[in-house]
Amino acid sequence: MLRVLTLNLQHCLPGAGAGDGTAASGSLAGADIRDPATARAVLTALAEQITELAPDVVALQEVDLGQARSGRLDQAAVLAELLGWCHRRFAAGWAGPVTGLRRRPLHSALARPADDVLGPARAVFGQGPVGFGNALLSRYPITAWRVMRLGRGPATLLRRGSPIDPRSYRLFTATARNLLVGRVELPEDVLPGVGVLNVGVTHLATRAETAHRQLDSAWGALTTLPGPHLLAGDF
């Protein structure tokens, strides 16, 4: 049997009761994860809870890479390390800080400065890549990766205040979405007769019409790959 867990991290912001129960780090509700040590403690508690569920593959959404709000950690890498898994991949929906200039990454992994148009400039000041997106972790080997852009929905203009005051208006742009697929090699006793499984992870838009289009694109791309396939995520 193969166990797949999908989880929206919400950049590991701890909610009420976080860390209670058997987690060694104790109660983390309200913890300030801008501190790297605290951010790692939250990931440690999460790794313990994931371990209790005994999954073989973990599909993650809303994952931070190098963001100040979450201790500037590579959340996917740290979580994979805490789980003792060697196979993982992060795919940025966008590069850049949450509160700054967001941009399309040149390469979704954001593994090196050249993967972001502003990466070389950041490297001059000793700053690594920064982004936000999906990730896939696996206890079993992953022999190939694919990433597909799913686009974004329309921008939204909101008004709070007088209709004749320009300061009353704010423009909110939709978040870019993507599909990350890993080709997972499975032992014979996990799913007899299934040597490989294409596992995809995505996070759809909140607008129904945009989400439907993104889901069609994601599923269509996944089903073109040889072998069985599974799509996980936040729908």
Annotate each language-model stretch with its function:
Residues M1-G131, L197:
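N-terminal, active-site-proximal structural segment of metallo-dependent hydrolase catalytic domains
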Residues N8-L9, V63, L204, G233-F235:
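Active-site metal-binding loops of divalent metal-dependent hydrolases
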Residues A29-P36, V63-L65, L150-L171, V201-E209:
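Surface-exposed cleft-lining segments at the edges of enzyme active sites
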Residues T51-A54, L186-V194, T223-G227:
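Glycine-rich phosphate-binding loop signature in dinucleotide/nucleotide-binding domains
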Residues A54, G84, R139-P141, P226:
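Residue-level detector of structured alpha->beta connecting loops
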Residues Q61, A91, M148, A205, ...:
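Conserved residues at the C-terminal ends of beta-strands
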Residues V78-E81, R207-F235:
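Metal-dependent phosphoesterases centered on the DNase I-like endonuclease/exonuclease/phosphatase
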Residues D116-F132, L136-V190:
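Active-site catalytic loop in hydrolytic enzyme cores
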